[in-house]
């Protein structure tokens, strides 16, 4: 039986205790993080999370032991995500907040050959501080629209030299460093995070907060409307359900001419409008003074509202003309596309 060094036993024991002591356990890759940025990250995490860097094999043993002692076999799924130079990040912060904190803590870094970029790399249009030389030819060989203007290299338009995930070549590293473009990031890359029996990957944690909030708001409104329309009472919808039922009952009573303190005004108002409609078609000598007065008031109201209605009609016509023009433009564009 091979002898196991005491420091390894102690390390596994300490890692196991850390894993057992926190509700959220994350794996992070610290392989390409220089010592100084790593120390700054430790400072930023102080009071929020505990970072422990160790050997991958020892981390794996600690996860297995903690999973067994806690009776949580799903914790072992974290082992599948150990890679690079792994470290354990133990915290009470939920995985989404932890991921956001780590991403916001990353700082730009210069280009290095052989390293994939985390996102698209774009060389912006405009003048540079680079003097004419062999670098211009290298740029043009890569398709970068560069030329000499006023004794300096100038980029004619924005140009994407790398897509996310593509690897930086030696030639491109020289160009990007000369331009002062830092396409890489220095920081802790979250590999996976465990909480309450679930292992979260970066793809799951990288959410658009505004979009997520909008989706939640839409879901709430759909659920609210469903509850109201099906008359399923909850603490949030009971008031709207009662209001809807009240208005529905009132409308039925008004339509049926059933007089109550709540419907009497609507019923008599409806009856009055019907009477005035009939009176408009009768000879004037058959009408009493009160009816004439009411008809006159109705006519004045109609005259006052007519300009507003005409304006709305004109606006609608203008909108229709604009829509027709845009449709014609679109059809013309399609014709050009297809010859």
From Swiss-Prot:
Superkingdom, natural source: Archaea
Span list, region Disordered: 305-339
Keyword Membrane part of the UniProt annotation: no
What is one Gene Ontology biological process annotated in the Swiss-Prot or TrEMBL record? ribosomal large subunit assembly
Q: Which Pfam families match?
A: Ribosomal_L10 (PF00466), RL10P_insert (PF17777)
Q: Where are the transmembrane segments?
A: none
Q: Which GO terms describe its molecular function?
A: large ribosomal subunit rRNA binding; structural constituent of ribosome
Q: Whom does it interact with, and what assembly results? A: Part of the 50S ribosomal subunit. Forms part of the ribosomal stalk which helps the ribosome interact with GTP-bound translation factors. Forms a heptameric L10(L12)2(L12)2(L12)2 complex, where L10 forms an elongated spine to which the L12 dimers bind in a sequential fashion.
Identify this protein by name.
Large ribosomal subunit protein uL10
Natural source organism? Thermococcus onnurineus (strain NA1)
The organism that produces this protein has a lineage beginning with: Archaea, Methanobacteriati, Methanobacteriota, Thermococci, Thermococcales
């Amino acid at each position: 039986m091979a002898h196991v060094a005491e420091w390894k036993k102690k390390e596994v024991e300490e890692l196991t205790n850390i894993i057992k002591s926190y509700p959220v356990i994350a794996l992070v890759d610290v392989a390409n993080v220089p010592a100084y940025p790593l120390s700054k990250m430790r400072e930023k995490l102080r009071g929020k999370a505990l970072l422990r860097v160790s050997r991958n094999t020892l981390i794996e043993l600690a996860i297995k032991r903690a999973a067994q002692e806690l009776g949580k076999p799903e914790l072992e799924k974290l082992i599948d995500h150990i890679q690079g130079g792994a470290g354990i990040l133990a915290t009470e912060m939920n995985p989404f907040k932890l991921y956001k904190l780590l991403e916001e803590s990353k700082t730009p870094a210069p280009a290095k050959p052989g390293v994939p970029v985390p996102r698209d790399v774009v060389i912006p249009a405009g003048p540079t501080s680079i003097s004419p030389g062999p670098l211009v030819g290298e740029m043009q060989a890569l398709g970068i629209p560069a030329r000499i203007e006023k004794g300096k290299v100038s980029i004619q338009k924005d140009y994407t030299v790398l897509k996310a995930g593509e690897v930086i070549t030696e030639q491109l590293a020289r160009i990007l460093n000369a331009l002062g473009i830092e396409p890489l990031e220095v920081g802790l890359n979250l590999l996976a995070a465990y909480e309450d029996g679930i292992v979260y990957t970066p793809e799951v944690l990288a959410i658009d907060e505004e979009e997520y909030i909008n989706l939640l708001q839409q879901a709430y409104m759909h659920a609210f409307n469903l509850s109201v329309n099906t008359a399923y009472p909850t603490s949030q919808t009971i008031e709207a359900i009662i209001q809807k039922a009240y208005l529905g009952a009132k409308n039925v009573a008004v339509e049926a001419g059933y007089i109550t303190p709540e419907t009497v005004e609507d019923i008599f108002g409806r009856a009055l409008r019907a009477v005035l409609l009939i009176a408009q078609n009768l000879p004037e000598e058959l009408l009493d003074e009160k009816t004439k007065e009411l008809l006159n008031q109705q006519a004045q109201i109609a005259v006052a509202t007519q300009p507003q209605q005409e304006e709305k009609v004109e606006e609608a016509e203008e909108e229709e003309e604009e829509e027709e023009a845009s449709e014609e433009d679109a059809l013309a564009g399609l014709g050009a596309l297809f010859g």
